[in-house]
Amino acid sequence: MKIFALQRQSHVAEGVASLSVSARITEVLEYMQYTSSDVQFVSLPEEHDLCRGALLWADTLILSKHSSLNAIALAEVAKKLGKKIIYDIDDWIFSFPSYSGGSGQNDKVENIRSLLSLSDVITVANEVLYRRLINTYPNLKLVPNGMWVEKYQRLAGEVLANEDIRPKIVFTNADLIKMESGKDSLFSALQVFFSKHQNYSLDFFGDPFPEIPSLPFLHFTNRMPYDSYMRALIRGRYDFSITPLGAAEDKESLSFNECKNPFKYLNYGAARVPGIYSSSSIYTNCVEDGINGLLVDNDYHSWLGALELLASNHSLREKIRNNAFDDVMKNYHIRFSADALLEVLEESS
């Protein structure tokens, strides 16, 4: 079984590789290759000179939210060669909200539809996407998100303690901040918390956003490859994490946000970092408040209260840390993703 996973640039950060392709496709293929000698794969950017050669070699072409004319041309070649085409979706790619840097992709919906029409199978990451698309695309299959926990636990064995001697919080965000009405409340809560707890720092991984200058306690690190990011989470030995996302109060972006995935919970759980999460549906579906995370409304008092609670309660942090890890290991392991993708590959071979 030979697979060509087409890489692309991020829709929300110009000039950098897509994290969706890495987390959703190549990580799963790497796991499948690690556990089975029957799977071989190659991944190349869509503009690479060797893409045509990779198509000749492969049995199957996998795309992930691609929208370029170049991707269409490659898919058309794959179709003529008799190759099977799988198109993966993990967001509502048919329209981006105004807060998103991906809103510039809204004029490429016809390109996406062209690629979907060329595809033998369309895979989606969650039940919400499945329900919204199944009537239009009957060739739809669910391939859930998952974490290759053991891959990163090998590194965790080198870490001597769960928390650094210097208390640190981690915040990860691709694109702009995914909140509208509650954004000022979040930033106010952070400013008050860090003014009271000047021994704490906030490590940020992701794309720059306009409000960074107002957060002098924030240490910015640009987005990095998925493997490197996971290693940074483990080596960071963070006290806890924050994950803001607009919920019911953000009417314009609610439908889009409901189609997102709780990958940050999966990442933090696998890295044993306890987290505070907005009470958005993607997190209320996997986080039990006070058990494997904290859930907060997107207002000033809720965010500040959760920050103070986790900062002051070591036993709660340890409880959440262990429960989240166990939950990800049991319910969100990459083996479920691999099993689902293998079924799709075998059906489309």
Predicted regions and their residues:
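N-terminal pre-catalytic "stem/leader" segment of glycosyltransferase-like enzymes
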Residues: 1-65, 71
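Conserved catalytic-core segment of nucleotide-activated headgroup transferases in glycan assembly
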Residues: 7-28, 148-236
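A charged, aromatic-enriched C-terminal amphipathic alpha-helix characteristic of glycosyltransferases
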Residues: 20, 298, 315-346
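Membrane-proximal helix-turn-helix segments that form the acceptor-binding/catalytic region
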Residues: 56, 76-77, 103-122
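Active-site proximal beta-strand in glycosyltransferases
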Residues: 78-95
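Carbohydrate-associated surface elements
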Residues: 128, 146
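Nucleotide-sugar-dependent
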Residues: 178-181, 227, 231-270, 276-287
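Conserved acidic donor-binding segment of nucleotide-sugar-dependent glycosyltransferases
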Residues: 262, 287-290, 294-300, 309-315
